Amino acid sequence: MTYVLGTHSEELNRLGRQHQIWQAEAMAAWDKAGFKSGDRLLDLGCGPGFASFDLAKRVGSTGQVLGIDQSPSYITYLNEQAAELQLPQLKAELLNLAGPAPLAIANYSWDGAWCRWLCMFLTDLNPLLELIKSSLRRGAKLVLHEYIRWDTFSLHPHGAAVAEFVNCCIQHWQSHGGDPNVASRLPALLQQQGFELVSSCSLLACAPNGHIKAQWLEDFLTSYPAQLIADGVWTQSQQAALEAEISQAKNNQSLWQTPALVEQIWQKT
């Protein structure tokens, strides 16, 4: 499965806003994992590199960050931005995450890896898991932020149109081989690869109107329906009902709940 949300400029900008909203949670996870100055870290499914830039600043000039993604436009953007930001310790490489890892990466020498919202888009997780296993040294940490229940994305009260949209997204991703509840499968898979789960927590959030997490959900509700309509799985009448429901929510006391995101920190044994 490819990244079904697209790699156009609108999605790039949305990813930037998304990273800002979830930046504190990412940095807290890196603290727990002990990512520090001088480390050599992988950013798996780095996209345009918003997390990579933060990781590069964390490891400093004595460290190294390698972003890996299968979108040529995102890799180009990341490398251009790394040069502009004067981050020579950061570079990105184009890699098919559904294929074998190159020997230059799979050398058992990396100190850690960061992976957020990637596993849910992969039809087959085995190549990624093999890449992680063959890249990290013993004792290295893998930090994952992936969804365990995407259908918790909801609006209360009067969220029928949002619920219909959420169900449409789930079916659309599953039809392309994705798994929006992938975090539930990761413990068994990573245990088989010789990893130990050392820390985990829920990052599910509930938020009122105007809260940054509510704005994040509204941002997605604004940007993604156009692609579902283009793919023929979401109608203009459904979109009109969704927009009316969001407008009503903004004019009343409403509670937004995010998809159930789970943090897992694993150590290679």
Residue ranges and their predicted role:
Residues 102-112:
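A short acidic, Gly/Pro-enriched loop at the edge of an enzyme's catalytic core
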Residues 111-126:
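A short SAM/SAH-binding and catalytic strip from SAM-dependent methyltransferases
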Residues 180-181, 198-269:
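Conserved Class I S-adenosyl-L-methionine
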Residues 20-39, 54:
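Conserved alpha-helix/loop element of class I SAM-dependent methyltransferases that forms part
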Residues 143-211:
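Conserved catalytic/acceptor-binding region of the Class I
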Residues 2-22:
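Class I SAM-dependent methyltransferase Rossmann-like catalytic core
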